[in-house]
Amino acid sequence: MGDDIMPISNLAKESEVRAVKDIPCKNIETDNHLEIGLSSGLSRSKDTSKFKKNSINTIKLIDDIIALHNDPKGNKLLWNDNWQDKIINRDLANIFEKIDESVSELGGLEMYQEMVGVNPYDPTEPVCGLSAQNIFKLMTEGEHAVDPVEMAQTGKIDGNEFAESVDQLSSAKNYVALVNDRRLGHMFLIDIPSNDQETVGYIYQSDLGQGALPPLKIADWLNSRGKDAVSLNKLKKLLSREFNLLSDDEKRALISETLDIHKDVSNVELDRIKRDRGVDIYLTEYDVNNFYENIETLKSKLSNYDKKLSKPK
């Protein structure tokens, strides 16, 4: 895909996907907080246990994201809400300078922690929106910056349109879906990598735990289930109106199988699902080479920053 990110509705001729009407949306918010989850893709096979990723070592990319998250400085580079600039152009010195300014404005670190409740210098545990949107930037940014909030405002489709579209995606291309499930109060990413065998999806997500699912840390998910394929049929059933036709037990089973780290049905609180809310999805093609190069650039930036700090003055 080129540097201009387009929704699937604008890629119909390339992907042979039925065009869908873009609906403007002022903001991407769940009922609790901004989130978006990552991963998951499509599967035309009932058995996904034998499937292996065949892109630019996607497993290594996930491990690199975990490593960046676990590094105190890499963490600050990765989880930031500056959507206007490219993720690889983020400046660590500038990030920490802004933290210093915020702390100073509130009268020092002790006062800041008392008022805000966190130490701003500590590593960030991103809510679902922060993790999903930043990984979306990692995957889709080429020459130009990508604003995931703006993209989703101008190119969203609903769960039924997603279910109709995914079966028609080209198996030779990579796609990513930014999902705002307002029923669950949750956002996550679905990575749909190219494959010459069977098409499946991978979910990237974290969760503050204020919706239908328990709290979830991004590294815990990526280490435990980030490399597990999710079938197309389950994703379509989860995100479309077909979900409403399921029994309560079937709903719990489906949600836990796709989104709970332990696949534990008891972790799903159906009474917290807002049945009158919908699902908004931004589905677009991405270049896996950009994904790889962006992660490598962040790793290099972090390494250079560490070397600079270690030089004697």
Curated annotation (Swiss-Prot):
Reaction catalysed by this enzyme = L-glutaminyl-[protein] + H2O = L-glutamyl-[protein] + NH4(+)
GO process annotations (BP): symbiont-mediated perturbation of host cell cycle progression
- Any idea of its EC number? 3.5.1.44
A GO molecular function term, named singly, is: toxin activity
Q: What is its main location?
A: secreted
Identify the GO cellular component terms for this protein: extracellular region; host cell nucleus
Q: Where in the cell is it found?
A: Secreted; Host nucleus
Q: What class of enzyme is it?
A: hydrolase
Provide this UniProt record's keywords sorted from A to Z: Host nucleus, Hydrolase, Secreted, Toxin, Virulence
Residues of the active site: C128, H186, Q205
Q: So what does this one do?
A: Protein-glutamine deamidase effector that inhibits the host cell cycle and other key cellular processes such as the actin network and programmed-cell death. Acts by mediating the side chain deamidation of 'Gln-40' of host NEDD8, converting it to glutamate, thereby abolishing the activity of cullin-RING-based E3 ubiquitin-protein ligase complexes (CRL complexes). Inactivation of CRL complexes prevents ubiquitination and subsequent degradation of the cyclin-dependent kinase inhibitors CDKN1A/p21 and CDKN1B/p27, leading to G1 and G2 cell cycle arrests in host cells.
Q: Which family does it belong to?
A: Belongs to the Cif family.
Q: What name is this protein filed under?
A: Protein-glutamine deamidase Cif
State the species of origin.
Photorhabdus laumondii subsp. laumondii (strain DSM 15139 / CIP 105565 / TT01) (Photorhabdus luminescens subsp. laumondii)
Identify the gene encoding this protein.
cif
